[in-house]
Every structure is written in C-alpha cells, then in structure tokens.
A protein has these predicted regions:
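Phosphate-end processing signature that detects enzymes handling 5′-triphosphorylated RNA
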Residues: 1-158
Length: 158
C-alpha cells in the first residue's frame, strides 16, 4: 500500500560521530535516482524496496512512497541516472522523542556523514536545538540533498 506524507526535516553535517554506534538500530541502504526533477528515488533498505516521489521544497516536502518487489526494484534500477548512494543509517534517539538519522556513506562518498531529524510540524523543526555532535546545518543547501550527492558528488569546500 502506498502512502503520501509531508516530510518535515532538518539536515546537518556531522562534527563528531557518536561513540558506540553498534548499540543503535542500523539499516544498510542502497539508493539511486530515476529523475532528480521531480525527485524519483529507488531505495533498498535491508530487504525492503521502495519507490519514492518527492516534491520540491526546503524543509517541508510532499513525499509519496510505494513499496515494490525486489524484481520491480531490479528492473527499475536499470533506469537510474548517475551515481548511486550506499550508506549505513543509524537511528539515534534524541530528547523529545526525536530520532537522529545518522548516515555514514560508502563507495564514492566514503568518509562523508550527515544527520537528519524529522519533525511532526514546522514549528517543532524551527524550535529544535541540535546536540553538540551535530555540525553545520545544510537544510537549505541543495548541494547536500541525496539526489545532488548522487548526481554531482560532494560539494567542493570554498
């Protein structure tokens, strides 16, 4: 069954990766993009396969997710544009029942990490104070969205 949701999130670079990552739930993720405008993403998360369409937006985006089979995933994977992303996503509990999704990338993006936090409302997102291990906020920098990372790689530091 498909689901349509608004995704409200903030994204940060990582100043310091927390210790003892093995104590947190971790997903192995492989994803690629059939299109980046609009964003049409294929994702394998462990043994789960999802086709996602996202609207444009900065902090708030409409997201439509459709579970697909492994066979459908493999057939659609041939349509992926550019590079793919491989990452481990760690779910780290924060205060106020929030969860930090720490992504540590592999392959072409090795040694890169970022962290996202999803919120129930824009107000909650605005009021959020990131923990000390979070680095610079990049929510409004489209160069750090996964579609851009897949298409262009890491932004150059200027």
């Amino acid at each position: 069954m498909s689901k349509e949701i608004y995704e409200i999130e903030r994204k940060f670079l990582v100043k310091e990766i927390p210790n003892n990552l093995q104590q947190y739930k971790c997903y192995k993720i492989k994803q690629g993009y059939i299109s980046t405008n609009p964003t049409i993403r294929l994702r394998q998360r462990d043994d789960e396969y999802i086709l996602t369409v996202k609207s444009s937006g900065i902090m708030k985006k409409l997201e439509y997710e459709l579970p697909i089979t492994e066979e459908q995933f493999n057939n659609l994977w041939e349509k992926v544009e550019g590079n793919t992303i491989e990452k481990n996503r760690y779910l780290i509990p924060l205060k106020d029942n929030l969860v930090a999704e720490l992504d540590i990338y592999g392959a072409d993006l090795s040694n890169f990490a970022n962290v996202e936090v999803e919120f129930n409302s824009t107000k909650d997102a605005i009021l959020f104070t990131p923990p000390d291990w979070f680095g610079q906020e990049v929510t409004q920098n489209k160069r750090y969205c996964n579609a851009s990372l897949a298409k262009y790689g890491l932004p150059s530091k200027k």
